[in-house]
């Protein structure tokens, strides 16, 4: 009894602490009926009076059980509160760590299976991980796990490949003893994923570039022509071919194995229905032979349809389809570019064009075609005749390049080899075109020709040189021969007069009119007189007889001053005398020296006028003396 009383007191204490708020709520609710009575003071009906009494009775009844049966209800509520965490703990304890790992691996395996199911070529050899793993049963809540699987399933093949690597690493290090897949199967799965990735990228590029989906035939062609070019860690050689390995996939649906092309083979020339039996390698020329092992990663693979040396047709804006060759850019060292770092399909190729002019450019993939695809008739439909001739030369060069191997093709018809060859060879076609179109080269040629002409003229004009000296002194031959012949200069005077008169075609003038003509000749005389007064010859001519001889020669009649001759003189009897050999040889010399005499006249303009007047007086006196002697 004492124990029961103690427990009863403890329950009362517990009820007081636990159920204090509900009692306060009940006390706070008591004014509500009074307020309800106050709101309706005018209601005197018996129903209105009985309702408050009923409320009071109900409140009293509620208070009694709380006091009388309070410990029992409090105990029940405590038990309920204790049962709830116990249930939660029981629920948490039901899922162990091993079970959690199993569920996690099952989810990953299901996502991997869904990725593998997308590729049809893997369905017949795909291993079922659930069958291989004994003791792992898929849970009954597959529908609940379906939503997370949809989220985990990758949208892009690249994420699927990374997820596959994580799953393989986890499966290799798992504690459940799961068997690790063989390397050949793993590589096959990787290739199937790469194939799926290529399909997705092909569709994406075609939609972006063409603005429409390609036809079914083109899609099949793209799937069949899976030429993967694996770029090695080493850099490309200067030739442009580089250290790359070319792989081609068999078109047979039962095989679809990747075969490595050895040797200088252009993959763009291969047919669409290429199979293993067309492989030149005898070790891998059948479909039943397993695929060659390859130790590489997916990031090193680029799905390129062309390699350095592939001959193609390229189209640029404003130009017709033009033959060219795929070659590495000499500046970048690459021959294709990607639109983004996530792509595995090149968006542009570097093309070196064939033809007389050496040129290169980056061309989009949609503007490239194989050399065998485009007909020559469509290409040659060009309105410009000049471009037609250049196009024919380019096509001929492409045919010559087609006859060589892919490695020799790059070395012989590459950009640098043709560009350097055009610079070195003087007879190169490219050099002749550049020189004909370049105005600077024409100016250089003209300048060289002018310099050569000036040098020749200077050689003729320069008195110090031995060669031009007789050419400049030819008009003074009679004067130089005077002192050598003898002291008397009269015979030489006559010969000089004869030689100059022989040049003139004007009939002899009467003697009476000679004075007037002499006056006119004296006015015009200083110009031809200066012509014969060269500085070098002045010093040499010291005799007075020679000076008289020169002055008399200047008086001889000539038709005009263009030949370096003097005005007409008054000598009517001279033409009746027979000319000598010296006189006959003199006119051509005078003709040759006419241009030189004009320049000499310009140099001697600065001589004083007084000297010219003194010479005019002396010449008039000598002329009279000569007339008296005759």
From Swiss-Prot:
Q: Report the residue ranges that make up the PWWP domain in this protein.
A: 308-374
Location relative to the cell: Nucleus; Chromosome
Gene Ontology process terms (BP): cell differentiation; double-strand break repair involved in meiotic recombination; homologous chromosome pairing at meiosis; meiosis I; positive regulation of DNA recombination; positive regulation of double-strand break repair; spermatogenesis
Q: What happens when the protein's gene is inactivated?
A: Male mice are sterile with complete azoospermia and reduced testis size, show impaired spermatogenesis, spermatocytes display meiotic arrest at around the zygotene to pachytene stage with incomplete homologous synapsis which is accompanied by defective DNA double-strand breaks repair. Fertility of females is normal up to mid-adulthood (5 to 6 months of age), at 3 and 6 months, ovaries exhibit healthy ovarian morphologies, however ovaries are devoid of follicles at around 8 months of age, and accordingly female mice become infertile.
The entry's Zn(2+)-binding residues are 250, 255, 276, 287
Q: Which residues form a coiled coil?
A: 435-465
GO CC annotations on file: nucleus; XY body
Q: Where are the zinc fingers (CW-type)?
A: 241-295
Please give the organism: Mus musculus
One Pfam family assigned to this protein is: PWWP
Instruction: Print the keywords alphabetically.
Output: Chromosome, Coiled coil, Differentiation, Metal-binding, Nucleus, Phosphoprotein, Spermatogenesis, Zinc, Zinc-finger
In Gene Ontology terms, what is one molecular function of this protein?
histone H3K4me3 reader activity
What's the reported outcome of changing residue 247 to I? Knockin mice show impaired spermatogenesis, loss of histone H3K4me3 binding, severe disruption of chromosomal synapsis and DNA double-strand breaks repair in spermatocytes
Keyword check for Membrane:
no
Q: In which tissues is it expressed?
A: Testis (at protein level). Expressed in thymus, brain, lung, ovary, oviduct and uterus.
User: By what name is this protein known?
Assistant: Zinc finger CW-type PWWP domain protein 1
Q: Compositionally biased, Basic and acidic residues: which spans? A: 26-40, 59-81, 141-152, 514-527
What is the top-level taxon of the source organism? Answer: Eukaryota
The answer, when asked if Zinc-finger is one of the entry's keywords, is yes
């Amino acid at each position: 009894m004492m124990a029961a009383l103690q427990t009863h007191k403890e329950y009362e204490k517990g009820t007081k602490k636990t159920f204090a708020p509900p009692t306060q709520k009940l006390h706070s609710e008591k004014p509500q009926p009074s307020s309800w009575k106050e709101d309706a003071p005018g209601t005197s009906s018996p129903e209105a009076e009985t309702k408050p009494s009923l409320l009071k009775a109900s409140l009293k009844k509620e208070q009694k059980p709380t006091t009388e049966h309070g410990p029992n209800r409090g105990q029940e509520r405590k038990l309920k509160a204790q049962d709830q965490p116990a249930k939660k703990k029981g629920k948490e304890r039901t899922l162990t760590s091993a079970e959690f790992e199993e569920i996690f691996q099952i989810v990953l395996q299901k996502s991997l299976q869904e990725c593998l199911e997308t590729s049809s070529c893997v369905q017949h050899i795909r291993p079922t991980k659930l069958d291989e793993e004994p003791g792992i049963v898929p849970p009954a809540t597959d529908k609940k796990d379906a939503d997370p699987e949809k989220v985990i399933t990758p949208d892009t093949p690249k994420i699927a490949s990374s997820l596959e690597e994580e799953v393989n690493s986890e499966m290799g290090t798992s504690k459940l003893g799961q068997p690790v897949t063989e390397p050949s199967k793993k590589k096959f799965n990787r290739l199937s994923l790469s194939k799926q990735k290529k399909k997705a990228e092909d569709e994406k590029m075609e939609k972006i570039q063409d603005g429409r989906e390609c036809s079914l035939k083109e899609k099949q062609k793209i799937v069949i022509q899976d030429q993967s070019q694996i770029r090695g860690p080493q850099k490309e050689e200067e030739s442009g071919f580089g250290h790359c390995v070319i792989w081609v996939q068999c078109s047979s649906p039962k095989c679809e194995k990747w075969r490595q092309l050895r040797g200088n083979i252009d993959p763009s020339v291969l047919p669409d229905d290429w199979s293993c039996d067309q492989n030149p390698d005898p070790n891998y020329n059948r479909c039943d032979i397993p695929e060659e092992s390859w130790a590489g990663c997916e990031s090193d693979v680029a799905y390129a349809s062309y390699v350095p040396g592939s001959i193609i047709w390229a189209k640029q804006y404003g130009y017709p389809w033009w033959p060219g060759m795929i070659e590495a850019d000499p500046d970048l060292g690459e021959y294709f570019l990607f639109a983004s770092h996530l792509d595995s399909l090149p968006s542009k190729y570097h093309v070196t064009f064939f033809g007389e002019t050496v040129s290169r450019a980056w061309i989009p993939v949609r503007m490239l075609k194989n050399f065998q695809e485009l007909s020559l008739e469509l290409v040659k439909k060009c309105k410009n005749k000049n471009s037609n001739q250049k196009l024919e030369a380019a096509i001929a060069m492409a045919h010559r390049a087609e006859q060589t191997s892919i490695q020799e093709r790059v070395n012989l018809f590459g950009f640098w080899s043709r560009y350097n060859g055009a610079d070195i060879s003087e007879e190169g076609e490219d050099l002749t075109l550049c020189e004909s179109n370049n105005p600077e080269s024409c100016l250089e040629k003209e300048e060289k020709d002018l310099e050569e002409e000036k040098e020749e003229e200077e050689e003729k004009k320069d008195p110090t040189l031995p060669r031009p000296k007789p050419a400049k002194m030819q008009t003074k031959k009679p004067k130089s021969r005077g002192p050598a012949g003898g002291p008397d200069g009269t015979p030489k005077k006559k010969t000089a007069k004869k030689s100059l008169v022989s040049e003139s075609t004007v009939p002899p003038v009467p003697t009476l009119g000679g004075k007037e003509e002499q006056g006119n000749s004296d006015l015009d005389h200083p110009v031809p007189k200066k012509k014969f007064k060269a500085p070098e010859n002045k010093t040499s001519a010291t005799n007075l007889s020679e000076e008289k001889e020169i002055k008399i020669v200047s008086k001889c009649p000539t038709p005009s001053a263009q030949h370096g001759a003097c005005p007409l003189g008054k000598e009517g009897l001279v033409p009746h005398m027979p000319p000598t050999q010296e006189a006959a040889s003199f006119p051509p010399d005078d003709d040759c020296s006419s241009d030189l005499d004009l320049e000499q006249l310009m140099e001697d303009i600065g001589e004083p006028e007084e000297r010219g007047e003194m010479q005019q007086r002396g010449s008039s006196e000598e002329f009279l003396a000569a007339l008296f002697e005759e």
